[in-house]
Regions:
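Membrane-interface helix termini and inter-helical loops of multi-pass transporters
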Residues: 25-31, 193
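Hydrophobic/aromatic residues within the transmembrane alpha-helices of Major Facilitator Superfamily
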Residues: 42-43, 50, 124, 128, ...
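Transmembrane alpha-helical core residues of multi-pass small-molecule transporters
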Residues: 95, 121-125, 211
Length: 233
């Protein structure tokens, strides 16, 4: 029942956006690129939200999420520029976890106020990565400490049949893309948005979005999740 209600709201939203596109002529409003960019930019927010969800459910107020993500982003950029994107992703996870570990030890083991610890991590992380950037890039290996290093892109793919992509040498049809190119009111707008959300999506984005239902299952459908939520209560 709740799922159907959400679907109705989603369809109504697409209809409103399609109407605005026709009235204003803003073709990018429902374009594939706009939907794809929105999905890509939502990944850091989703990951931070999931981190905050687990922290809150365990009884820890985690204001230091920003600092942890800053640390992970720096490590991912530096290691990724040296050893490739997958090594950079692993380094980002490890370096970000260090910040989480510091917060956990400070609040749980030493009883430091959660807000104070979180704010401290945010401040320290910002200064730490600035110092590390100056230290690592001072010899001209990169234009400067304020410039992001170049990293190879992680491969992308699409939903078979619906959004194109390539699977084991087989080139999948792009049904949604074909419908989007027909320029039918609402139908093509809906297809264009769905094409942006399911086509040319990075594997990391796929995993990040998959973490949402997985986190729900862990927290509300497993014994571990029950114990975690009980500890937070």
């Amino acid at each position: 029942m709740k799922t159907m209600k959400l679907l109705r709201y989603a369809v109504m939203l697409v209809f409103v956006l399609a109407s605005i596109r026709v009235i204003t002529g803003a073709s990018d409003l429902t374009s594939t690129g706009t939907a794809s960019a929105a999905l890509l930019l939502s990944v850091p927010i989703v990951l931070a939200a999931l981190g905050g969800l687990f922290s809150e459910r365990s009884g820890v107020v985690n204001i230091g999420l920003e600092g942890m993500m800053i640390m992970g982003a720096w490590a991912g950029g530096y290691i990724g520029s040296q050893h490739g994107p997958w090594a950079g992703l692993l380094a980002a996870m490890i370096f970000g976890s260090v910040g989480a570990l510091v917060h956990a030890i400070a609040t749980v083991s030493f009883g430091v106020d959660h807000v104070v610890s979180g704010v401290a991590i945010n401040i320290i992380a910002a200064g730490l990565v600035r110092y590390l950037s100056t230290l690592m890039y001072k010899n001209g290996a990169w234009p400067g400490p304020s410039q992001s290093p170049g990293i190879e892109t992680i491969p992308v793919n699409g939903l078979p049949v619906l959004s194109g992509g390539s699977y084991f040498g087989w080139k999948s049809p792009d049904l949604l893309g074909s419908i989007a190119n027909l320029n039918w009111f609402f139908i093509s707008d809906l297809a264009s948005i769905l094409r942006g959300l399911t086509g040319d999506v990075s594997y990391v984005t796929m995993v990040a979005i998959a973490f949402v239902p997985i986190s729900y299952f862990i927290l509300w459908r497993t014994a571990f999740g029950l114990r975690l939520r009980s500890a937070g209560e």
